[in-house]
UniProtKB/Swiss-Prot annotation:
Gene3D superfamilies, per database record: YejL-like
InterPro entries: UPF0352 (IPR009857), YejL_sf (IPR023202)
Protein family membership: Belongs to the UPF0352 family.
UniProt-listed HAMAP family: UPF0352
Protein name, entry field: UPF0352 protein Sden_2336
Species of provenance: Shewanella denitrificans (strain OS217 / ATCC BAA-1090 / DSM 15013)
Pfam families attached to this UniProt entry: DUF1414
Amino acid sequence: MAIQSKYTNTQVEALISELLAVLAKHQAPTDLSLMVLGNCVTHLLENKVPSESRQAVAEQFAKALVKSVK
């Protein structure tokens, strides 16, 4: 989603591949997959982002997500 990233494409693609493999292993339908991934995002925001930054980070993430599907 990011235009520039401090992470390599290899790092990003490896994580994507592993996450999708887990969803496939569990034969998770699209709605369940999106729900689980959304809950993961919420978990990361609540546990890894300082409370004073959460709203802004969540909004940036949401904007990037919308932009990525246009």
